[in-house]
Each structure stands twice: as C-alpha cells, then as structure tokens.
Amino acid sequence: MRHRFAFFAVLAALVLTAAGCAGDASSGQAAAPATTAAAPGPTTAPPTTHTETTRHAPEGLVPTGRREPAPGLRVTAFDGREIDLARWKGQPVVVNFFESWCVVCRAEQDALTEVSRRFEDQVRFVGVSNNDTVSEGRKYQREFEIHYPLANDSSGRTWAAWGVPYQPVTVVVDQRGRIAWRFDGGLEPGQLDPVLEYVVEV
C-alpha cells in the first residue's frame, strides 16, 4: 500500500514538472511584437513659379484693339519698282514721309537708315517724297546709303490719304495692316527701335 502511494506521488510530481516546463517553453517562444517602419508621408513638390515679363508699350503706341487700317499706298520708286503696301501684309512696315531738301528729314536720316538695317529681315521700309524728282531722290538715296526703296507721290494723293501736312512723318504699320504708331517730326536716334521691337514680338 505504501509502495502504491509512493508511485502515485512520483507520477503526480512528474506531471506537474512537465506542465511547468511546457508553460516556460510557451512563454519563452512568444513572438516579440513586430516593428514596422513608418511609411513616409506624401512628399509635396515645391510650387512651380512662373515669371512673367511684361514689356511696357513704347510711348505713342496704339493699343492693338484700337488700331485703324492703314490707307492704301501704291507708288513708283525712284528705281522703277512698283510699291504696294497691300503686298507687304504679314510684315510690319515703316513709312517715312520726307523731302530730300528738308533739313529735319536730313537730320533724322542717318538714324532711320541705321534702324532699317537692324530690322531689315523683319520689317519693311519705304520713304515717300512729295515733290522730289527722280534724280533728286536717287542722289539723296546714295548720299545717305539708303537700301530701302524711296518713291515720289507727285500727285499728293498718298500724303493726303495718310493725313500728312508736312514732313517728316513716320508711321509704323503692323502685320495686319493697321497703324500702330505715328510720329510727326524728326526722329531722335534710338526712338524707333523700341517701337519696332514691340511690334515685331507682340
């Protein structure tokens, strides 16, 4: 009887020991909480900045919405060429009303010749006299080395149509055949350049 009691006591001790080991093993194998890297927040691109360069219109330039169509201009150049303003539509045109004997016209001519060479690939130029003869016109053209055509309006109709009471008068016609700028009197050096730069670009 004593041996049977001892047997059960040993068996119970073994069972308790096994249960304790199992508990230790279970708690020892518990997984550590997973550590996940925080997802990066959405990156915001820096705002795009747009820089607008506003070119200020030169003094006297007519706003595009208020420009009037230029009168017709059909004249014969001193070299025999027929000049028709309508054929030049699509390009800006400078029309200079002058006389070869006019002191103010002669004073502005060097500056006018210079700007005409600067813009010769972008802008057409023509000079229109009122009463110069062919020989006078050609002499004036050679004297100032003018490469653009000069013509004579002996009838005075062109000057009248353009409202030119005296010389010199310079008119800039835009690509659509409208009057963009007009100056009555002698041009100063550099005065016409910003006008043409604006008309060509806008």
PLM region spans:
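Bacterial N-terminal signal peptides that target proteins for export
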Residues: 1-9
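C-terminal motif of bacterial Sec signal peptides marking the signal peptidase cleavage site
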Residues: 16-20
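Structural microenvironment flanking redox-active thiols in thiol-disulfide oxidoreductases
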Residues: 106-144, 154-160
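Thiol/disulfide oxidoreductase modules built on the thioredoxin-like
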Residues: 139-146, 154-201
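Extracellular mucin-like PTS domains
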Residues: 33-54
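Bacterial signal peptide processing site
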Residues: 21-25, 103
